[in-house]
């Protein structure tokens, strides 16, 4: 016997109110299910008061308006110090090392489901926390819980939540994970919530709408270098390897070269030793394709992970379709993964997340690529 959510029994849920439509509707749905609901707004980044890019003040205003409309308390907390130490420093260190990190995954791990949960426990006496993420939880008859993809395949966010522990999933509720996005907006509109037509947030929260290269340059000095073809010909100059990622097509500034075909150029390698960006033409160029990878910093939601030589599926980036793979343990902290078919633009530093059907098993950080 399994169920998708625990019963309320008047238990207290602290909802992470972001000022967006998903958390707004999450709070409403939990109230309808009989939970005692309160909101908690997190401030995770200390921007200048004059900063035109960060909408934290507007988000706080919207979150408060929603809580007032629903008739629930709203609390605020500042996690900027924790965010800087555990998310932003990691983000900078990874870029400095030539990798491409995903700070949203680290934010979920360290802030939204750790610092937030601790605050909800210690200060607000919570039974559960809830977020507006598009994932589901399943409660099994043996007391275990599993994290499943969201019903809306276009909005599923399990890729960003693979680092959650079994205990964190057991303490978390995800009401909108059972719905399609359009249904969430319809509920918000019927309720007259100010967030019903608010644009979804995109990009990295501490960058906002700013140009990524400009933001990064304020923290890491750029080191210009050559752009070479896969045959070794110098065809341009890059402004810094950290601004580029494997598989990147736009923003290279090397179109229309003599004696080359019209296929677009893609980044296929970053040579950190020589500070050279290597490019090749065509999205299926052999230098862009991988037949496997090694993955470390493993985390399994159910604590144990899949069995050795398991045949499951993997995503190596968000919104990528699942690819079949075979997973082999090299030791407790490292695995080798062989794909059922070649995969383009697998990127060290990004996360590989594994699935068994709809169940998110967990994942790790891509370390090295296997080609050929």
From Swiss-Prot:
Site, as annotated: Interaction with tRNA: 133, 350
Location relative to the cell: Cytoplasm
InterPro entries membership: MnmA-like, MnmA-like_C, MnmA-like_central, MnmA-like_central_sf, Rossmann-like_a/b/a_fold
EC number(s) from the headed UniProt entry: 2.8.1.13
GO MF annotation list: ATP binding; tRNA binding; tRNA-uridine 2-sulfurtransferase activity
Residues bound to ATP: 16-23, 42, 132
Main location: cytoplasm
Sorted UniProt keywords: ATP-binding, Cytoplasm, Disulfide bond, Nucleotide-binding, RNA-binding, Transferase, tRNA processing, tRNA-binding
GO biological process assignments: tRNA wobble position uridine thiolation
Chain intervals for the UniProt region annotation (Interaction with tRNA): 155-157, 317-318
Disulfide bonds: 107-205
Reactions catalysed according to its record: S-sulfanyl-L-cysteinyl-[protein] + uridine(34) in tRNA + AH2 + ATP = 2-thiouridine(34) in tRNA + L-cysteinyl-[protein] + A + AMP + diphosphate + H(+)
Spans annotated as Interaction with target base in tRNA: 102-104
Pfam families, sorted: tRNA_Me_trans, tRNA_Me_trans_C, tRNA_Me_trans_M
Record-level GO cellular component terms: cytoplasm
Active site (record annotation): 107 (nucleophile), 205 (cysteine persulfide intermediate)
Its job: Catalyzes the 2-thiolation of uridine at the wobble position (U34) of tRNA, leading to the formation of s(2)U34.
Similarity section: Belongs to the MnmA/TRMU family.
PANTHER family in the cross-refs: MITOCHONDRIAL TRNA-SPECIFIC 2-THIOURIDYLASE 1 (PTHR11933:SF5), TRNA 5-METHYLAMINOMETHYL-2-THIOURIDYLATE -METHYLTRANSFERASE (PTHR11933)
Name the UniProt record assigns to this protein: tRNA-specific 2-thiouridylase MnmA
Organism: Shewanella frigidimarina (strain NCIMB 400)
């Amino acid at each position: 016997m399994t169920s998708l959510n625990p019963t309320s029994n008047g238990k207290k849920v602290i909802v992470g109110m972001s000022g967006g439509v998903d958390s707004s509707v999450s709070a409403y749905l939990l109230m309808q299910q009989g939970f005692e609901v309160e909101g908690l707004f997190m401030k995770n980044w200390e921007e200048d008061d004059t900063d035109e890019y960060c909408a934290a003040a507007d988000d706080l205003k919207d979150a408060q308006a929603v809580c007032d409309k629903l008739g629930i308390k709203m609390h605020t907390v500042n996690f900027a110090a924790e965010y800087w130490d555990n998310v932003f420093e990691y983000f900078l260190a990874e870029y400095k090392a030539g990798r491409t990190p995903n700070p949203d995954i680290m934010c979920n791990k360290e802030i939204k489901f750790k610092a937030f949960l601790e605050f909800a426990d210690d200060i607000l006496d919570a039974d559960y926390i809830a977020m507006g993420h598009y994932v589901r939880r399943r409660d099994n008859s043996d007391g275990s819980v599993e994290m499943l993809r969201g019903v809306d395949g276009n909005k599923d966010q399990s890729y960003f939540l693979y680092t959650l522990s079994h205990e964190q999933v057991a303490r978390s509720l995800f009401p909108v994970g059972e719905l399609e996005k359009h249904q969430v907006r319809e509920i918000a509109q019927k309720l007259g919530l100010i967030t019903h037509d608010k644009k979804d947030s995109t990009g990295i929260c501490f960058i906002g709408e700013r140009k990524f290269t400009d933001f990064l340059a304020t923290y890491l000095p750029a080191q210009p270098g050559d752009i070479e073809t896969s045959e070794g010909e110098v065809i341009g100059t890059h402004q810094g390897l950290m601004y580029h990622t494997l598989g990147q097509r736009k923003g290279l500034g090397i179109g229309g070269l003599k004696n080359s075909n019209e296929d677009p150029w893609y980044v296929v390698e970053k040579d950190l030793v020589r500070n050279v960006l290597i490019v090749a033409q065509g999205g299926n160029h052999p230098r862009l394709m991988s037949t496997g990878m090694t993955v470390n910093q493993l985390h399994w939601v159910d604590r144990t992970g899949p069995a050795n030589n398991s045949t499951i599926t993997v995503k190596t980036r968000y919104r990528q379709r699942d690819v079949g793979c075979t997973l082999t343990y090299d030791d407790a902290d490292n695995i080798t993964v062989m794909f059922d078919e070649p995969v383009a633009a697998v990127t060290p530093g990004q996360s590989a997340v594994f699935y068994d059907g709809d169940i998110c098993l967990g994942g790790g950080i891509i370390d090295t690529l296997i080609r050929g």
